[in-house]
């Protein structure tokens, strides 16, 4: 799974994308509703000289949650302190981060759904009252003291918003869902990335990469790097529509953005479960994958594109998926 080219989960080689990420809302492409709302919220907070309300960003991986957190920090003029749910194992880890924040800073917690209940309890007063409750001592002599924190903004990201507890979710004043990108916006993103990477690319080449990127900018930039390699070796370095088509065919990413794992999922439900309904645990066992991989990585795009229906009785293939077979 880790080496799957169109896996939207971040890989080590995706770190080069940091150089081409937009740094302001004006440069941010796509997500028009989110962009317009954040422009208003950020400008209003700046005019009042206040910290932005705590913000929760959720959606499938690879759509720009971390990028948006960076943009929020830059637009608000504060420093960005980043961590993730699995990293914050002890109460002291979070307390250290909170006490090092300065007024107007942005604390970004990725995968916030993986926070432990103990860490969540510390976050509640920090988010609500900008206070940190610390226990000093042990046993009968233990006492609690409150530390005042400077006004800050917590920006949290998750691919599993449904796993957040209600008390935590209710403390976010702003909640934004990122949607899959359309081909037009992805084409603009690919063209911009190509320009920043000094890749000569025709409009047709950008469209070909965009249409196979599964609505995900991270995948689009990853495919662009591989298509660039192909163009340099097999041609004169220019990425045309024909070159992009040949490169992506070689990489086994078809024109619908499906790869061998997607096709295997569809074929498995068709052959083993008679087109469904089939339980996700049964499909995962048949494919030798875990349930989380199916729900977070494979199914979102298949459902969004209309290949699979998620029903109370299980997963069902649509006629579109059957026709592909």
UniProtKB/Swiss-Prot annotation:
Binding residues for Mg(2+): 66
GO molecular function, one term: ATP binding
Sequence positions that bind DNA: 291, 310, 315
Keywords: ATP-binding, Cytoplasm, DNA damage, DNA recombination, DNA repair, DNA-binding, Hydrolase, Nucleotide-binding
Keyword Transmembrane helix recorded: no
Record's catalysed reaction(s): ATP + H2O = ADP + phosphate + H(+)
InterPro entries: AAA+_ATPase (IPR003593), AAA_lid_4 (IPR041445), DNA_helicase_Holl-junc_RuvB (IPR004605), P-loop_NTPase (IPR027417), RuvB-like_N (IPR008824), RuvB_C (IPR008823), WH-like_DNA-bd_sf (IPR036388), WH_DNA-bd_sf (IPR036390)
Any one cellular-component term (Gene Ontology): Holliday junction resolvase complex
GO biological process, any: DNA repair
Region of interest (Large ATPase domain (RuvB-L)), residue spans: 1-181
Subunit text: Homohexamer. Forms an RuvA(8)-RuvB(12)-Holliday junction (HJ) complex. HJ DNA is sandwiched between 2 RuvA tetramers; dsDNA enters through RuvA and exits via RuvB. An RuvB hexamer assembles on each DNA strand where it exits the tetramer. Each RuvB hexamer is contacted by two RuvA subunits (via domain III) on 2 adjacent RuvB subunits; this complex drives branch migration. In the full resolvosome a probable DNA-RuvA(4)-RuvB(12)-RuvC(2) complex forms which resolves the HJ.
Record family assignment: Belongs to the RuvB family.
Function recorded in the entry: The RuvA-RuvB-RuvC complex processes Holliday junction (HJ) DNA during genetic recombination and DNA repair, while the RuvA-RuvB complex plays an important role in the rescue of blocked DNA replication forks via replication fork reversal (RFR). RuvA specifically binds to HJ cruciform DNA, conferring on it an open structure. The RuvB hexamer acts as an ATP-dependent pump, pulling dsDNA into and through the RuvAB complex. RuvB forms 2 homohexamers on either side of HJ DNA bound by 1 or 2 RuvA tetramers; 4 subunits per hexamer contact DNA at a time.
Designated name of the protein: Holliday junction branch migration complex subunit RuvB
Species of the source: Psychrobacter sp. (strain PRwf-1)
């Amino acid at each position: 799974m880790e080496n799957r080219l169109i896996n939207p989960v971040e890989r080590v080689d995706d770190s080069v994308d940091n150089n081409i990420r937009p740094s302001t809302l004006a440069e941010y492409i796509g997500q028009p509703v989110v962009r317009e709302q954040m422009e208003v919220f950020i400008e209003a907070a700046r005019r009042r000289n206040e910290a932005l309300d705590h913000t929760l960003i959720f959606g499938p991986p690879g759509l720009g949650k971390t990028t948006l957190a960076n943009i929020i920090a830059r637009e608000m003029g504060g420093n960005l302190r980043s961590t993730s749910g699995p990293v914050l194992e002890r109460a002291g880890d979070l307390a250290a981060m909170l006490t090092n924040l300065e007024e107007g800073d942005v604390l970004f917690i990725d995968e916030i759904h993986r926070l432990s209940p103990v860490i969540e309890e510390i976050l509640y007063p920090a988010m609500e009252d900008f206070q940190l409750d610390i226990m000093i001592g042990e046993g009968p002599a233990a006492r609690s003291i409150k530390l005042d924190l400077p006004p800050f903004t917590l920006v949290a990201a998750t691919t599993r918003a449904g796993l957040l507890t209600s008390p935590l979710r209710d403390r976010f004043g702003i909640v934004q869902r990122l949607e899959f990108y359309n081909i037009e916006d992805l084409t603009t993103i690919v063209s911009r990335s190509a320009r920043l990477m000094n890749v000569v690319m025709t409009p047709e080449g950008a469209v070909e990469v965009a249409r196979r990127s599964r609505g995900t900018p991270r995948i689009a930039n990853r495919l662009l790097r591989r298509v660039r390699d192909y163009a340099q070796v097999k041609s004169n370095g220019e990425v045309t529509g024909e070159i992009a088509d040949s490169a992506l065919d070689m990489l086994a990413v078809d024109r619908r953005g499906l790869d061998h794992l997607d096709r295997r999922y569809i074929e498995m439900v068709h052959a083993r479960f008679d087109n469904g309904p089939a339980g996700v645990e049964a499909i995962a066992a048949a494919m030798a994958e875990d349930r989380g991989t199916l729900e977070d990585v494979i199914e979102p795009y298949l459902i969004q594109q209309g290949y699979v229906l998620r029903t109370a009785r299980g997963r069902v293939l649509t006629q579109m998926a059957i026709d592909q077979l």
